[in-house]
Amino acid sequence: MISSLHRPTVARVDLEAIQANIDKIQRHIPKKVKTYAVVKANAYGHGAVAVSKAVEDQVDGYCVSNLDEALELRQAGIDKEILILGVILASELQLAIKHQLTITVASLEWLELAKKESVDFSQLHVHVKVDSGMGRIGVRSLAEANQLISILSDMGVQLDGIFTHFATADESDHAMFDKQLTFFKQLVEQLDKRPALVHASNSATSLWHSETIFNAIRLGIVIYGLNPSGNSLSLPCPLKEALSLESRLVHVKQIQAGDSVGYGASYVAAESEYVGTLPIGYADGWTRNMQGFKVLVEGEFCDIIGRVSMDQLTIRLLQAYPIGTKVTLIGQQGKQVITATDVADYRGTINYEVLCLLSDRIPREY
């Protein structure tokens, strides 16, 4: 998708805020551990390459979701460790070795496929994934973990780490978290051969369960300044939201009582009012169900009226503002603030999704 560079809609990313957030979280951790910056999904919509370069001196490596995301970083000159959290195709092992990428091994079945590949396994770096209760990928028993590690050792693979992922670390009820933690700790303690690196701490675990950290952490949503729990749990240290979303009025008109706006004529004016049009829509990740949400114009809240279209949306203005007036959809304007969590709450989703949905049509400015 081509960025719309000639359209007045932009996502501004404060890289210094991301750096400051990492510093605060690292100081919150009770011991020195290895730090991975999670930059999957285009760094949660913030721009993977720009973010990775900005935090290079603060982290030991990066986590991505897939091989393509890892290759993007390598092609941009990022040479620190990159851990691919998802499972890659066994047929792509040579690419992983060529670019010195660390892969995740999650099952014996996959390993049997990998053994058929003609590659130099002594150059392959892996972390073993344990499914302690998340239910997606990973070995699910001590016997399976020991068998997998034994085969990897026989193959001459560089076994660097073992890890798991918590399903409820951002919730006030700790029952499931404690169950997963106990399972993982017992499994690691009983391994016939324990890898040097052990990690289970995502953003939420690093914030609210820092006493459970092993010797590495994976920092994702928190480095971008967002609370993993939404507003359910209080942050133990203040963070700054790094991304703001702005557009500008491209059309302003006055409508009369009875006039309708948008697809389905879902909004009908009750009286004479001013309406402004913004060049942003659901193709940009500003979803169709945002009718009724408020944006900021000259520091005042204005309602989105009518259904959000593919490329445009309309707002009810307090007065006839001139074309080119800035409109803030996420961020601060004057004394008022709209957060990604506010958007998420309105949509009935999570702040992660709000940022990840922002499409490549929206240019990022740093």
Curated annotation (Swiss-Prot):
CDD domains given in the database record: PLPDE_III_AR
SMART domains on file: Ala_racemase_C
BP terms from Gene Ontology: D-alanine biosynthetic process; peptidoglycan biosynthetic process
Pfam families associated with the record: Ala_racemase_C, Ala_racemase_N
EC numbers on record: 5.1.1.1
UniProt entry tagged with the keyword Transmembrane helix: no
Reactions listed under catalytic activity: L-alanine = D-alanine
Presence of keyword ATP-binding: no
Pathway assigned to this chain's UniProt record: Amino-acid biosynthesis; D-alanine biosynthesis; D-alanine from L-alanine: step 1/1
Name of the protein described by the UniProt record: Alanine racemase
